[in-house]
Amino acid sequence: MLISELTKNTDCRIIGSDCDISRIEYDSRKLTGGELFCCIRGTFKDGHEFAESAVARGAAALLVERELPLSVPQIIVKNSRHAMAELAIEFYGHPLDGIPVIGITGTNGKTTTTYMIKAIAEKAGYKVGLIGTIRNLIGDRIIPTDRTTPESVELQRVFR
């Protein structure tokens, strides 16, 4: 997908030429070439620190909060984590449009509650997906996860 298509609904400034993006990624170790690398500020690390290595690993463009002295196109936004979520929705074609979603929060009982709701919905004839800390399920298909709280990009990939 071209950067111009990807960013059509995002408040941003684009530096550099329009290019094709093969995937959206925020972990520089997972780059294979052609991706948009999202520089996300975290509690302990700032993804901007990995931008140079991401470009060396084949990132086609960067999502950043400030312009970096690198020769690839850059999408500059106020909040890269928020923009990554918007771009993932666009990239994966708005996969949740028209699909009911139930979110469960709290300290205790979330896993039990989700599996109870899943069982009830399936008995009622609905096809059910479940995103949880243990695993992700879409119908009978198990989708492994390595994070207890998936990032927006993983969620959109699973929803697709």
Feature roles, as predicted:
Residues M1-E86, E90:
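N-terminal leader/targeting and accessory segments in enzymes
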Residues T10, M84-R160:
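Phosphate-binding loop of NTP-binding sites
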